[in-house]
């Protein structure tokens, strides 16, 4: 109506029935999600859904994922071992059948960047995974493996998705890095480091305490 240039609409945590951890089920806020997606697609819009990989007990894949997850709970949910092909298959199949086939063609993959520098909200370095990885190794690979899983869900569908952590030399993934950086020093560090990934970065400048910053 106002000729605002926009072709990707992103839905944040409220689309889930439970967001921390995630249910991957549509909230009552969206009573007819498939019809909504069809209408938006017909108008030329792409729909991008926010999520993270920690699966709430109400998630349809929770039971199947129990034996393919790390040994800690995060926000009351399990976290899949995406280095395990079966975990990727379960996660990707659900996303494809429930969301992608309905018209979703992008995802915003959050909360996969925890480290010693970002607090203790995620799984610890001492975690163990069915694939044999430990928590330290999995923190480094989490974002890249998450992207790989979502690419399997999307099949050959074109996408421009977002991820909060990915490794170096990741230019083969159609994702954009983003970050929740609240400190100016962290922001500058991100500027310097982002090019190693080989993909675009969209920074969020949250705070400036001086004119110089």
Region annotations inferred by a language model:
Residues 3-213:
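Aromatic- and carboxylate-enriched substrate-binding clefts and catalytic-loop regions
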């Amino acid at each position: 109506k106002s000729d605002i240039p926009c072709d990707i609409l992103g839905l944040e945590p409220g689309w889930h029935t439970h967001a921390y951890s995630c249910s991957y089920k549509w909230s009552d806020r969206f009573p007819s999600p498939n019809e909504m997606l069809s209408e938006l697609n017909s108008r030329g819009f792409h729909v991008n859904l926010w999520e993270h990989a920690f699966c709430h007990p109400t998630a349809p894949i929770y039971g199947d994922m129990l034996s393919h997850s790390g040994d800690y709970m995060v926000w009351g949910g399990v976290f899949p071992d995406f280095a395990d092909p079966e975990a990727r298959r379960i996660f990707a199949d659900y996303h494809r059948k429930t969301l992608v086939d309905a018209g979703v063609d992008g995802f915003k993959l959050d909360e996969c960047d925890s480290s010693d520098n970002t607090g203790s909200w995620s799984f610890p370095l001492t975690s163990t995974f069915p694939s044999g990885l430990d928590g330290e190794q999995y923190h480094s690979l989490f974002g890249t493996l998450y992207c790989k899983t979502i690419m399997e869900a999307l099949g050959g569908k074109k996408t421009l998705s977002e991820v909060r952590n990915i490794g170096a030399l990741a230019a083969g993934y159609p994702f954009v890095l983003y970050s929740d950086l609240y400190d100016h020093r962290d922001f500058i560090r991100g500027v310097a480091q982002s090019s190693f990934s080989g993909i675009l970065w969209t920074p969020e400048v949250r705070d400036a305490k001086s004119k110089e910053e």
